[in-house]
Amino acid sequence: MKKHLLFLGAPGAGKGTQAELLSQTTSYLHLSTGELLRKEIEMNTNLGIQVKDIMNRGELVSDELVLKIVRQNLVKDNIGWILDGYPRNLSQADSLNEVLSEINQPLEVVFYLDIPEEVLIERLLLRGRKDDTEETIRTRVDIYKKTTEPLIQYFKDLSLLEYINADRDLKTISSDIKQKMA
């Protein structure tokens, strides 16, 4: 069974949900970059202090800093891991592959959670978050298309990509993912 996994998909496609479900049934480490950054800040580590300072200025955390945090968590692996929310662009994907090669934990499969845009927008609006207006959601989807969608071809070229129809119920999606891990 594959044990070094990545979930890719638009905001609201269900990456975090599916990664967490899989983590619970496999004991694989679920590495969400957002949660990793928050954890570093909460623990007041040197990296966390840098991240907090950057975020307080309203800036994006650099690729290098995110990669450092991801790397230190991957090194802890002894069972398996699931990456969610990283990489977000081709540069990050190249850097991640270099790190995974260095620590001898190559990526084994990338699950692309594919979902129609209108279903995605409806799903995000139903979440009821204050910042989830139709306008902000469409902006996030547009940014995703420009920066993250090229990763689909990147991982397809590496023969790592598995398409998952994310416009179904949680159990069916989860079952599909587990079958493709075998």
From Swiss-Prot:
It catalyses: AMP + ATP = 2 ADP. Pfam families: ADK. Residues 126-132 are annotated as: LID. Keywords: ATP-binding, Cytoplasm, Kinase, Nucleotide biosynthesis, Nucleotide-binding, Transferase. GO terms for molecular function: adenylate kinase activity; ATP binding. Its EC number is 2.7.4.3. Gene3D superfamilies: P-loop containing nucleotide triphosphate hydrolases. Consists of three domains, a large central CORE domain and two small peripheral domains, NMPbind and LID, which undergo movements during catalysis. The LID domain closes over the site of phosphoryl transfer upon ATP binding. Assembling and dissambling the active center during each catalytic cycle provides an effective means to prevent ATP hydrolysis. Belongs to the adenylate kinase family. This is Adenylate kinase. It comes from Prochlorococcus marinus (strain AS9601).
